[in-house]
């Protein structure tokens, strides 16, 4: 099948499609920033806003020269607001609750103080970071190793879905930092001979609200019981909830709270947000139209189900787009491979379930397309947070069908502002319809073959009972739904 993907050359005029310059979309006004709030005088609260002075360097915050050099090497020109507010407090030895939007630099905000303390008093098993997903755990470890390269920090990633024996060997080598998903860490605490965290100095719970959304609460309780009381604890999250408040009371001592966004559903000011109201039957056609509008830019397309992720990836590849799927039913190596290809630019479109919506380090995403609407405002915030990161601009467009109007109205209400519609010309969109329909037929056949292959494999395994059911359950919890 011939490609419908617009390429930025004169050959577009012979493709059979109407050739035109991608017009500038009608921009929605960026969400207004919250008014600066006065610092709460309560000893437990330390508020910050993005209006504060931005000229401070990492050295001004108290970071030592060797770590400042690492920041410079990684291209960290100046601290982000969450880093400016939290690092000095962490260096004072306080427990912290850090609240800031996705993409604000939370990882360096807790990694730098831990590495500086490790530099002063080096010891094995110094810090533990708990993360909700395997991908996020790997990325946090990479950040620690990059920032701590000068001091040769050693990290171990302990996550579900991987062989426990190599992990036990890695723990036996006494790394400085462990980054783990809760279920697999508890497996090792209970079953790996000689492994304990009695000497731990730092605990970080990253994406704490997501940890609790995935029902890790009981496992976290068990982990907290075996950790030393004399430790520093940092809890970082994009949003706050009653569950997070309960976790804070159970695990932190007299914490200071750093909050960069006073609005629970705040998005960054460099993000353009639009919606497009379309009939359900034409979603694929509008998707191809938009991808041509944003030709040459990287994009994440969010879907609700694994099947839809697979189908759209096949559809796009059939039409000549470099698309790759990411969802929770892929093997760990396949998921990491998909992310690496997308980061490297060998694939420009990532089609993903919400497994990709939280914490993933993909700094160059230009466009987020909500092909399927998220079911709540919090998920929407984390999806669109994949673009407009670290001060860059970005664009998010949500597909609103006749069945999504109520959800979209709730999201707009939570954001506190109505979004503008992305302007399209129906005749220009429908030019793509014949080729899209042909690609849809091909995708349906491919999906049918895929399901038949899976059915055959399932028949072979039918009736087998997995050994060690409890351990398997924890591994399943370590995997993101979808």
From Swiss-Prot:
Catalytic activity: ATP + H2O = ADP + phosphate + H(+)
Subcellular locations according to the entry: Nucleus
Signal peptide location: none
One function term, GO molecular function aspect: ATP binding
GO biological process: rRNA processing
SMART domains the UniProt entry points to: DEXDc (SM00487), HELICc (SM00490)
GO CC field: nucleus
Its EC number(s): 3.6.4.13
Binding positions for ATP per the UniProt entry: 100-107
Motif DEAD box, chain ranges: 206-209
CDD domains per record: DEADc_DDX47 (cd17954), SF2_C_DEAD (cd18787)
Entry keywords, A to Z: ATP-binding, Helicase, Hydrolase, Nucleotide-binding, Nucleus, Ribosome biogenesis, RNA-binding, rRNA processing
Broad class of enzyme this protein falls into: hydrolase
Main location: nucleus
Residue ranges annotated for the Helicase ATP-binding domain, each copy included: 87-258
Alphabetized PROSITE patterns for the sequence: DEAD_ATP_HELICASE (PS00039), HELICASE_ATP_BIND_1 (PS51192), HELICASE_CTER (PS51194), Q_MOTIF (PS51195)
Every Helicase C-terminal domain range: 282-430
Subunit relationships: Interacts with the SSU processome.
Comment text on domains: The Q motif is unique to and characteristic of the DEAD box family of RNA helicases and controls ATP binding and hydrolysis.
Protein family: Belongs to the DEAD box helicase family. DDX47/RRP3 subfamily.
Function: ATP-dependent rRNA helicase required for pre-ribosomal RNA processing. Involved in the maturation of the 35S-pre-rRNA and to its cleavage to mature 18S rRNA.
Protein's name according to its UniProt entry: ATP-dependent rRNA helicase rrp3
Species whose genome carries this gene: Sclerotinia sclerotiorum (strain ATCC 18683 / 1980 / Ss-1) (White mold)
């Amino acid at each position: 099948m011939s490609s419908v993907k617009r390429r930025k050359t004169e050959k577009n005029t012979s493709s059979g499609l109407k050739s035109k310059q991608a017009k500038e979309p009608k921009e929605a006004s960026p969400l207004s920033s919250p008014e600066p709030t006065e610092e709460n005088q309560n000893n437990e609260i330390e508020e910050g806003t993005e209006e504060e002075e931005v000229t401070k360097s990492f050295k001004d915050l108290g970071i030592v020269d060797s770590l400042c050099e690492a920041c410079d090497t990684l291209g960290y020109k100046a601290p982000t607001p969450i880093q400016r507010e939290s690092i000095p407090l962490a260096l004072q030895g306080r427990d912290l609750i850090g609240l800031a939007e996705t993409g604000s630099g939370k990882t360096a905000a807790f990694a730098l103080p831990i590495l500086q303390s490790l530099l002063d008093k080096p010891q094995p098993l110094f810090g533990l970071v708990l993360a909700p997903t395997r991908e996020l755990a790997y990325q946090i470890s990479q950040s620690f190793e990059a920032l701590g390269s000068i001091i040769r920090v050693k990290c171990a990633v302990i996550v579900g879905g991987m062989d426990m024996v190599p992990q036990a060997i890695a723990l036996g080598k006494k790394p400085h930092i462990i980054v783990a998903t809760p279920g697999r860490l508890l497996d090792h605490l209970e079953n790996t001979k000689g492994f304990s965290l009695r000497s731990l100095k730092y605990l970080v719970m990253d994406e704490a609200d997501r940890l609790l959304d995935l029902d890790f609460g009981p496992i976290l309780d068990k982990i907290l019981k075996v950790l030393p009381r004399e430790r520093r604890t940092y809890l970082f999250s994009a949003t706050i909830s009653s569950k997070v408040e309960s976790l804070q009371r159970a695990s932190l001592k007299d914490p200071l709270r750093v909050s960069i966004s006073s609005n629970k559903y705040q998005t960054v000011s460099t993000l353009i947000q639009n919606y497009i109201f379309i009939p359900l039957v034409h979603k694929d056609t509008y998707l191809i139209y938009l991808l041509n509008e944003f030709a040459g830019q990287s994009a994440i397309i969010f879907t609700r189900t694994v099947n839809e992720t697979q189908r759209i990836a096949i559809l796009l590849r059939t039409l000549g787009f470099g698309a790759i799927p990411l969802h929770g039913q892929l093997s760990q190596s396949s998921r990491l491979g998909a992310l690496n290809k997308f980061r490297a630019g060998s694939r420009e479109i990532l089609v993903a379930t919400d497994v990709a919506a939280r914490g993933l380090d993909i700094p160059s995403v230009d466009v987020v397309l909500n092909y399927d609407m998220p079911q709540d405002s919090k998920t929407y915030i984390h999806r669109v947070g994949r673009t407009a990161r670290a001060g860059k601009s970005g664009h998010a467009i949500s597909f609103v069908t006749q069945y999504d109007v109520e959800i979209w109205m709730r999201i707009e209400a939570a954001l506190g502002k109505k979004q503008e519609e992305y302007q399209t010309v129906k005749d220009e969109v429908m030019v793509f319809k014949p080729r899209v329909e042909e690609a849809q037929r091909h995708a349906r056949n491919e999906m049918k073959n895929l399901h038949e292959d899976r059915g055959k494999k399932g028949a072979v395994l039918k009736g087998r009972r997995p050994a060690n059911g409890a351990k398997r359950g924890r591994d399943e919890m370590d995997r993101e739904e979808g």
